[in-house]
């Protein structure tokens, strides 16, 4: 049996003493003065920063929103029932941030960046603050590249460019989200990364949207950020900023990204709730005074950055829900004034079967015209005017039956144009498909058919063009302009199709 030598013991002890490193964990702490309704008042964290994360017992995090003389107002980002008066709160020294990068594509996360799709950790290595300063004037370049939505009515009459902010506004349940989802599906194989931000929605609704995106192979280039109705108001409020930071990651690397905020009305309500609980003075409709700044600083982060910075873009499609079509309410007017145009959806059109239910007269794209390709301008240049004149004539025509031939022809053409602008959900179209259908409508190829036939005409003419005239479709997609020779080819192809369609 080995004997233990005294020298060895002394050597071991002296080595341990030598290697001993005293670790002191110094952190600034505070005490919970009061807590309730998702808001905690903390005394003692004198050096806390705005938007800084504080740690409550049990690992619950809170975000500093109010900095007052003797305490700070903190919005709790978790279950407030586990926090009680007198609890010790630690400063983290970190401003609220979120994981970003390619690893988030195909995933569903909450507003703090935690995965909620049951697929394990994200594996993201980079982080970004949720609040970033928007690019300055010099760092931007004009919007001049198209961002196709795949919807004929939008791409023809209110075109959207990369880096634009186009508002989708309308009452509840009339297809606002459907436009956003179709726009995401249309980005397949274009290299555009998509972010869908669900704010204040039911979890079942978010689940359904994710399933629809998966069904159409759109999740591979999409990240869903969910601040659901059951989440604390703070998470619903910061979800939009978190989603924007993910989009900025791609924008700042020279890529193109598209973000859908669904919807900013619920975000405003969540922010109003937080502000009132923090005892901030209420303004119009009880919203706080900085609600405009809340939306403007979010939407200004969507931009097309200059070529020196990579030339990337972040396009935003914010959604606003109106009450009984009132676009002159506080939040709708705010967001209309911030964005570069709006697509206005009307219940009366929706219920009469015109879907997407876009009101052409009230919808506008302030900067997208410069991004619209020449081929689309050639076929849809007068479409908006034609439809506006048709609506005006239609309202007069109901008072009298004796109309001259020209007026009757204009009315007939208008009915057919309205018909070809209808489009089913989850069926976004390519540029060539849109151009062919609109060419047929605006050049009078549909005038000879009954209105009921138009619905059958569109899928059949597209199938015919793809099988017999793929070269024409390819040329439209590649050159994005209709030359006189190509126009002649399209006319001949559509004339040839007429005999097939009539016979069929």
Swiss-Prot record:
<dbReference type="GO" id="GO:0043531">
    <property type="term" value="F:ADP binding"/>
</dbReference>
<dbReference type="GO" id="GO:0005524">
    <property type="term" value="F:ATP binding"/>
</dbReference>
<dbReference type="GO" id="GO:0005886">
    <property type="term" value="C:plasma membrane"/>
</dbReference>
<protein>
    <recommendedName>
        <fullName>ATP synthase subunit alpha 1</fullName>
        <ecNumber>7.1.2.2</ecNumber>
    </recommendedName>
</protein>
<keyword id="KW-1278">Translocase</keyword>
<feature type="binding site">
    <location>
        <begin position="170"/>
        <end position="177"/>
    </location>
    <ligand>
        <name>ATP</name>
    </ligand>
</feature>
<dbReference type="Pfam" id="PF02874">
    <property type="entry name" value="ATP-synt_ab_N"/>
</dbReference>
<keyword id="KW-1003">Cell membrane</keyword>
<dbReference type="InterPro" id="IPR000194">
    <property type="entry name" value="ATPase_F1/V1/A1_a/bsu_nucl-bd"/>
</dbReference>
<keyword id="KW-0997">Cell inner membrane</keyword>
<dbReference type="GO" id="GO:0046933">
    <property type="term" value="F:proton-transporting ATP synthase activity, rotational mechanism"/>
</dbReference>
<keyword id="KW-0139">CF(1)</keyword>
<dbReference type="InterPro" id="IPR020003">
    <property type="entry name" value="ATPase_a/bsu_AS"/>
</dbReference>
<keyword id="KW-0406">Ion transport</keyword>
<comment type="subunit">
    <text>F-type ATPases have 2 components, CF(1) - the catalytic core - and CF(0) - the membrane proton channel. CF(1) has five subunits: alpha(3), beta(3), gamma(1), delta(1), epsilon(1). CF(0) has three main subunits: a(1), b(2) and c(9-12). The alpha and beta chains form an alternating ring which encloses part of the gamma chain. CF(1) is attached to CF(0) by a central stalk formed by the gamma and epsilon chains, while a peripheral stalk is formed by the delta and b chains.</text>
</comment>
<keyword id="KW-0066">ATP synthesis</keyword>
<keyword id="KW-0067">ATP-binding</keyword>
<dbReference type="InterPro" id="IPR000793">
    <property type="entry name" value="ATP_synth_asu_C"/>
</dbReference>
<keyword id="KW-0472">Membrane</keyword>
<dbReference type="GO" id="GO:0045259">
    <property type="term" value="C:proton-transporting ATP synthase complex"/>
</dbReference>
<dbReference type="InterPro" id="IPR023366">
    <property type="entry name" value="ATP_synth_asu-like_sf"/>
</dbReference>
<dbReference type="Pfam" id="PF00306">
    <property type="entry name" value="ATP-synt_ab_C"/>
</dbReference>
<keyword id="KW-0547">Nucleotide-binding</keyword>
<dbReference type="InterPro" id="IPR036121">
    <property type="entry name" value="ATPase_F1/V1/A1_a/bsu_N_sf"/>
</dbReference>
<dbReference type="InterPro" id="IPR027417">
    <property type="entry name" value="P-loop_NTPase"/>
</dbReference>
<keyword id="KW-0375">Hydrogen ion transport</keyword>
<feature type="site" description="Required for activity">
    <location>
        <position position="363"/>
    </location>
</feature>
<comment type="function">
    <text>Produces ATP from ADP in the presence of a proton gradient across the membrane. The alpha chain is a regulatory subunit.</text>
</comment>
<dbReference type="InterPro" id="IPR005294">
    <property type="entry name" value="ATP_synth_F1_asu"/>
</dbReference>
<keyword id="KW-0813">Transport</keyword>
<dbReference type="InterPro" id="IPR033732">
    <property type="entry name" value="ATP_synth_F1_a_nt-bd_dom"/>
</dbReference>
<dbReference type="Pfam" id="PF00006">
    <property type="entry name" value="ATP-synt_ab"/>
</dbReference>
<comment type="similarity">
    <text>Belongs to the ATPase alpha/beta chains family.</text>
</comment>
<dbReference type="InterPro" id="IPR004100">
    <property type="entry name" value="ATPase_F1/V1/A1_a/bsu_N"/>
</dbReference>
<dbReference type="InterPro" id="IPR038376">
    <property type="entry name" value="ATP_synth_asu_C_sf"/>
</dbReference>
